[in-house]
């Protein structure tokens, strides 16, 4: 797998951070993931959030019902941690193979996170149980105090929450999701084998200038927010190094167009249709295509203790234009890189 390959064959990838929503939105977006990825970690921030085994089983079935015939896709369900969650319910879901991991949202950090955790101490019995049974903790790593600048929230989270937590529960497996800063890249790289990270395509391809200079681009607005270019470069260097505890997590987060193009727009990039080709472009730009397959298809399963997929897909290097929009009942979705010409795409 060396540039300038015209066709890139890799083991089927997995998406270790995905939002599928529910209802008509779910039915619209599921096929864009299920046609490419073997598995995906599905976020639980519905309204109401997924906090019980029964809710997760029902949601998993709704996802499977939306998978087109011929797609071989397994949704991996997560539990939304709350201050009042029963550790026994979490353990039951994990033992029954319903919950793959549990998600920590600091209260009000992102979309539908108002039920999130108010403090680590409030959920310590749950976290201690997770450490005991080997259940991974997935973390949206931002503090949400009103007096902390939005561009500093990830770095402050590391020092005030993440490091004290990992010092207290040394055997807990933690995924630091959608990292966006040099601080986080360095922290994960310097950590032990129980700490990993996911990175989105938008945080590898863009920085805050792309979102804000020459006009506001709402379809690049996501949380954690895009940072300055020194942070983008640190993320690119981390994936290009072949570091084996960082892996693909798109954080694909669809919102209808009118909810993005608004005076108070929603955070999230719907990147499922274009993410894999976007990652390939970054790896090619960094002269690191030899590490692309591991990032997409190997590092994640290894950290989670799951087998790699036994099928393969191909990406083709030829210019294609991304659709301007995707139909959604009585609205539209605007995909990541809408209307732009991309270099790599999945071979159909």
From Swiss-Prot:
Active-site feature positions: 251
Keyword S-adenosyl-L-methionine: no
InterPro entries the record matches: Amidohydro-rel, DHOdimr, Dihydroorotase_CS, Metal_Hydrolase
GO CC annotations, alphabetized: cytoplasm; cytosol
Effect of residue 255 to N: Lack of activity
EC numbers on record: 3.5.2.3
Keyword Zinc listed: yes
Binding site for substrate: 19-21, 45, 140, 223, 255, 267
Role, per record: Catalyzes the reversible cyclization of carbamoyl aspartate to dihydroorotate.
This protein's name: Dihydroorotase
Organism encoding this protein: Escherichia coli (strain K12)
Gene: pyrC
């Amino acid at each position: 797998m060396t540039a300038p390959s015209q066709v890139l064959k890799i083991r089927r990838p997995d998406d270790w951070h995905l939002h599928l929503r529910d209802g008509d939105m779910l039915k619209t977006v599921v096929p864009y993931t299920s046609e490419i990825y073997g598995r995906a970690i599905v976020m639980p921030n519905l309204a109401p959030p997924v906090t019980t085994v029964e809710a997760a089983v029902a949601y998993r079935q709704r996802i499977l019902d939306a998978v087109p015939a011929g797609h071989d896709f397994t949704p991996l369900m997560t539990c939304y941690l709350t201050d009042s969650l029963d550790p026994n319910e979490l353990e039951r879901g994990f033992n029954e193979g319903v919950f793959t991991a549990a998600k920590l949202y600091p209260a009000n950090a992102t979309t539908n996170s108002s039920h999130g955790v108010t403090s680590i101490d409030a959920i310590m019995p749950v976290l201690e149980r997770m450490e005991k049974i080997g259940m991974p903790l997935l973390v949206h790593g931002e503090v949400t105090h009103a007096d902390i600048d939005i561009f500093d929230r990830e770095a402050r989270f590391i020092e005030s929450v993440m490091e004290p937590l990992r010092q207290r529960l040394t055997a807990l497996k933690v995924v630091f999701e959608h990292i966006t800063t040099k601080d986080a890249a360095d922290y994960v790289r310097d950590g032990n084998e129980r700490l990993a990270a996911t990175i989105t395509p938008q945080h590898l391809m863009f920085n805050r200038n792309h979102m804000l200079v020459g006009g506001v681009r709402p379809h690049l607005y996501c949380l954690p927010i895009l940072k300055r270019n020194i942070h983008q470069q640190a993320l690119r260097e981390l994936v290009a190094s072949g570091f084996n505890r960082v892996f693909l997590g798109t954080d694909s987060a669809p919102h209808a167009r009118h909810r993005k193009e608004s005076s108070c727009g929603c955070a999230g990039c719907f990147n499922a249709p274009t993410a894999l080709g976007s990652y390939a472009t970054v790896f090619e730009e960094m002269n690191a295509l030899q590490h692309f397959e591991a990032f997409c298809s190997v590092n994640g399963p290894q950290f989670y203790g799951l087998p790699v997929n036994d099928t393969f897909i191909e990406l083709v290097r030829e210019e294609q234009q991304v659709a301007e929009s995707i139909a959604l009942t009585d609205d539209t979705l605007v995909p990541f890189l809408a209307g732009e010409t991309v270099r790599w795409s999945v071979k159909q």
